[in-house]
């Protein structure tokens, strides 16, 4: 008898559940309404912050706060070796980031000495720039790697002096009130349109020697590294994004 009652109750429950959604409109969501972002071929989207477009490094500065003094010419700018890193004046958290870069032709150079630079998100987490076209080096230090942490899924590098691009989703770490890590940073990277990193969970800030680790920090700038190579850049933009 108890079993019969249970079966009847279950049948009634399933019937009532089925009656909850009887029209297509019952499962339609109308709010919130996503904001409109205009998009264009080979141009930044309408809500992007333009970090470099044509002929000015006004959005950048040196680490000591002095004006960025890399060479600007014909809508591109090029590292002036020995002058030091530059970083954005604005600080960021989670971002979608686009950059185009070009390695010089360097005869006789190989490994890490061939077209080396890097993009440091929040001044700490490095996406490596390197001429990795027919250039052997440690694989967690080639183009598309999260330096000394994650090897790229593939090598999508083009020949030297051919323009390349990165499209990056960087999700910043969060910290507890006592400064300890709450959620670690993660990064997704497309190199020349090819997925090379997918939601990799960063082990900490980039280090050349030793293991990476997290130390408390707030939002930070995007830094471009002077590693002694005349890497050129153009069409740099960023979108601030919110994540649940």
Cite the ranges covered by each PLM segment.
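Bacterial Sec-dependent N-terminal signal peptides
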Residues: 1-19
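Carbohydrate-interacting regions of secretory-pathway proteins
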Residues: 18-244
